[in-house]
């Protein structure tokens, strides 16, 4: 069993202001997206997007992630609670974000952005898809530092005891699994896959399939939300939300891979 490194969730204090690691990870994630996106633009990988376009897209994507992530959590995970306590929807400091909701928020942003810039939607989504795992990796590291979203009890040699779980049981460090698969591995795969010319929509399709598949697998080691538990077929909410992603990605890939009709 490995020792969980208890890290102060506050990264920096400036007088009464406390900067938490989790919020800092969000900033680092967006900074990485900007850095690697700028590199692709300046290297001539794309002629459709400019650095200014990237800056605008990231700015509006922050809004999409926050609003979509919060509303996704409200609708997917605790609809009854927030229906009875609607003002708590705005209590962002209490936590509660959904990746799948955040993704929907970013898709809406990309649709509006593509329309405004007169670009094809897949031109935008194929450009940004390989960069999203960088933000995911930073976010999962923030989860690990916070000691939250831990895994299920296990006896594997690398199990850890997360103090906030309250039961003292060794558990999977599922945050690190997600960091590795949904973050590092998915980024490497998409960066390589998108380095060559692809039909419009195929990079986006690979992201949907890759993230959905990795999230589905990791959920077998992740402790389900205590207010939901496991749902139909013994699957978690995260798994049920990931299945449509994989199916949509597969359908999009097959559709875009078809030769043009004559």
Swiss-Prot record:
It is found in: Cell inner membrane. Its EC number is 2.5.1.145. The keyword Cell membrane applies. Keywords: Cell inner membrane, Cell membrane, Membrane, Transferase, Transmembrane, Transmembrane helix. It comes from the Bacteria. A 1,2-diacyl-sn-glycero-3-phospho-(1'-sn-glycerol) binds at residue 140. One of its GO terms (biological process) is lipoprotein biosynthetic process. The chain crosses the membrane at residues 17-37, 57-77, 95-115, 119-139, 173-193, 200-220, 227-247. The keyword Transmembrane applies. It is a multi-pass membrane protein. Its main location: membrane. It is an enzyme of class 2 (transferase). GO terms for cellular component: plasma membrane. Pathway: Protein modification; lipoprotein biosynthesis (diacylglyceryl transfer). GO terms for molecular function: phosphatidylglycerol-prolipoprotein diacylglyceryl transferase activity. NCBIfam families: lgt. Catalyzes the transfer of the diacylglyceryl group from phosphatidylglycerol to the sulfhydryl group of the N-terminal cysteine of a prolipoprotein, the first step in the formation of mature lipoproteins. Belongs to the Lgt family. HAMAP family: Lgt. This is Phosphatidylglycerol--prolipoprotein diacylglyceryl transferase.
